Amino acid sequence: MFDPSRHTVLNPATWDPAVARAAIQDIARDAATGFDPKAYWPAHPQDGIPDGGAGLYFGAAGVLWAMDFLRREGVADHPLDIPTLLPRLLEVNRRQYAAIAPGSKIEPRRPSYLFGDVPVLLMMIRAGDAGAADDLFGRIEDNLDLPALELMWGFAGNMLACVFAASVTGEDRWRDLFLAQARALLDDLEDTERGPVWTQHLYGRATRFLGPVHGYAGNMLALMRGWDWLDDADQARIRQAVPATLTANAIRGELGVNWPPAISSDPIPTLVQHCHGAPGMVTALADQRIDGPDLRELLEGGGELTWRAGPLAKGSNLCHGTGGNGYAFLKLHELTGAEIWLNRARAFAMAAIEQYRAASVEHGRGRYALWTGDVGLACYLNECLRGSARFPTADVF
């Protein structure tokens, strides 16, 4: 059901809100201290990328978004004047994206949520930039033929951007743009013997990914974020499709339930992470709007496996770390109201804090990234303090 070498034993530690608050403040303080207005932040050795990245996933856009979010939440204070940094960040992001996109077989003209300019424009909209909304709208409207049917490079990320832009601007045009993408996405949903699925054309190959970053769960998450904009027929289709696909691809065992990263001839899963495996499936799809007894049983089985597997050895981060896995527990607590899930989320939080502090000592520095670094953990700790389940940039922006 999982690879034990990818996990560590959970050392029991009593949940301590003061410890969580202190970790958030330390993370924010370190990020502010390590910031350079021209070079941004150095890359972490474990990320294997050049210094000064400007994207959302593991670059300056993600760190600045998190720093702004944590300040809005009232859990971190820092001196960064984020709105003044955004125009240059947009330029740097676009220049970097034009250089890296072809290496992933992505056309540089295509917008990307996790690596491109989409989140930077969203931040500029929030900061009151007069032209950013039109810029973002045009970028998405000009790319309604995206070949990537997923969140990182494709429709799902841009659909989330429409939802967040609408919440800030109050403009109806974002609804229409969301629905144009939703229609294209649902038209490409294929009925197969493994349930309704999408085929992702990524990195020069066709794959039917299931997870929230590259696959099925991420597409459904985006559709559900615009739920009130969908008509009754599309809502009914989603309610039918999600349990059908999760049931058809679930791997059940005594330890719980897992899902493979993709539909293939060898579906035995070993990954238990947000990006691939049970935690991400639970976090993306534990939603009251599609809840039902069969789906809930599967999702709780995924949560049980996540708990039994234990914290991830890769560290405290969101994408493939302990913090990201903990969101599955927060989502199940939100869905079911059962306190056991909140207690488990907070147990993972204490473990993740230990991992963060140990890694900081080992490397002599922090890890400056949203999806793979310390500020993502800070966002998770804030949710554990609140008892809520908002995954950064997927549920809240």
What are these model-predicted stretches?
Residues M1-A60, W65-P87, L179-R194:
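Low-complexity, Ser/Thr/Pro/Gly-enriched N-terminal "stalk/linker" regions
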Residues M1-D30, R225, W229, D287, ...:
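Terminal, non-catalytic domain-edge segments
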Residues F2-P17, A61-D77, P119-A130, M159-E171, ...:
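Well-ordered alpha-helical scaffold segments within catalytic/enzyme domains
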Residues R21-Y40, D81-G103, G128-A148, L177-V197, ...:
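Long, well-ordered core segments of solenoidal/helical folds
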Residues P42-A60, Y97-G116, N143-F155, H201-A217, ...:
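Solvent-exposed loop and edge beta-strand segments that line ligand/cofactor-binding
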Residues F115-P119, G131-D135, W153-L160, T169, ...:
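Residues forming well-ordered secondary-structure scaffolds
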Residues R173-I290, R296:
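Extended ligand-binding clefts on enzyme/binding-domain cores
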Residues T306-W341, F348:
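Loop/turn-rich, solvent-exposed surfaces of beta-rich toroidal or solenoidal domains
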